[in-house]
């Protein structure tokens, strides 16, 4: 998601 370090992992 938005707060993930790498976009897309959560």
From Swiss-Prot:
GO terms for cellular component: extracellular region; membrane; other organism cell membrane. It is found in: Secreted; Target cell membrane. GO terms for molecular function: toxin activity. The keyword Lyase does not apply. Its main location: secreted. GO terms for biological process: monoatomic ion transport. Disulfide bonds: none annotated. Keywords: Ion transport, Membrane, Secreted, Target cell membrane, Target membrane, Toxin, Transmembrane, Transport. It comes from the Eukaryota. Exhibits unusual shark repellent and surfactant properties. Forms voltage-dependent, ion-permeable channels in membranes. At high concentration causes cell membrane lysis. Shown to be 5-10 times more toxic, cytolytic and active in membrane pore formation than pardaxin-2. Monomer. In aqueous solution exists as a tetramer. Belongs to the pardaxin family. This is Pardaxin-1. It comes from Pardachirus marmoratus.
């Amino acid at each position: 998601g938005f707060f993930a370090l790498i976009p897309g992992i959560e």
